[in-house]
């Protein structure tokens, strides 16, 4: 019988297999080998006096690790053999730079690719990574800011490679995983998925290459990912990182990643004519809403009798529904009107990508601005608006106002047409207005309540905000204010401090660890809203008055809609008085809501635009602000329902229905005010 190898020789034998194993297995086995080495060095037998129970356990463990590595080696060999062949569409501008980009990926750890709209960067870069030899030691991961983009990009790459989605190319989004761990090479995912994976594996060992697409959007998720990767590339020298965007601040990103090389790719653009709408005369009353202006613009395009599909950008889902209803009522011949927004069911989203005999009019939010390409678009109608979160440090509130988009976003929208032929972009604002807008939308971290950022970082275990390597670090005072607010709301507990032998806190002693989330704080972190609002809504849910407090919370997020024209102040005050509760402004908000939109409920409050206008004229309210209140209420309701907080009250505890037009606050009055 052959004599067993000593520990040291057996360990060296296992270590010799490491280079040919997949990276994730290599990392896991190395950790276990370190543990075994510590065990053997601490006095475990070496086999010279015959194996005992401890020695057998160690040898068994080494045999197990060897088998694990050999399985991983076989998998790596299969991946090397089965790596898909790739080619690139000749009509894409990025194809002309394929050699330069592949060489940069091979020779540099981090590469920045700045590609204009239509360059093909989103679909071709993962294939360039395969051509550069990546995807064997681990997966090529690519993040997208939206679920619809992740799905459509994965499907497009799979189609170009002659693969079925879920094989060599797959995707993972919330509640849906179509990626094969055994056979997958390219994985497209939302940035939120990668963040979640980083909590379970801080070294992201599954991946040998990561592509962060649309980095110019600078959402909190993207900034969190870039911060994680700034640290990770220093410890994982084998990891390749590509940062890509249509409109990126290349100098800032290159500097953040140690002067990483930048490759610029031009876009494929047929000529696009831009038509502007002149501003109304100063002092003149605006008679048309942006929805009505957009519909008139579509009417004009239809009258031109030139072919091509139409893409209309709207800021909110409510606007999309109203626009679609109005356009369908026009009765255009051989035309199909299709909505597109993030929460639309996937089957309905996919309709916009299909080739149809009818002319398509797609009405979309800014999900259609980047990453996804709706085929056949020749006309773009741009309202120039989006709902952009904004924190006001003076009032300490976060709102979701309708805001003018940046020039960069406007150019992205323009780039959606002119992909297959000359296009026309109709902007429902003036050229002067466009020129006066900022070049980029400020990063979300600069528009956010820092308490919300801190809350999310604690929930994601990202470490202390003061030392996190943000691309644009927040000011120290704002960080302090953020912590102060979270303490006030009961969302975090102060760090425990070191104590002496008698249990007394040592003067000036550092804390054992940073602040931690309370149970309430963890609930708040699950609701992506201003922490003061999420705290209010959690309390309301516990006190069975969530629908009413959602009305109040959304009302507090917009400008007071009540109007008092100088020449009609008495009439306005009389109209407002019918909704006023003498003891509570909050109940007054609920009274207004009930009169206009019906009883508060955790569902969409729908009222036709013409009916809302009539209500506003009669009662001296701003149509624009009432509409904004309605939109914010819908956003909060959707967030609460997604988080599980907005579920219906069980039937056996539901209150008696109230007579129409009446509201008995004897039971709920105190609960509402305690929550608020």
Give names to the regions the model predicted.
Residues 114-116, 485, 522-528, 533-676:
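Extended, charged helical/alpha-beta scaffold domains that provide interaction surfaces
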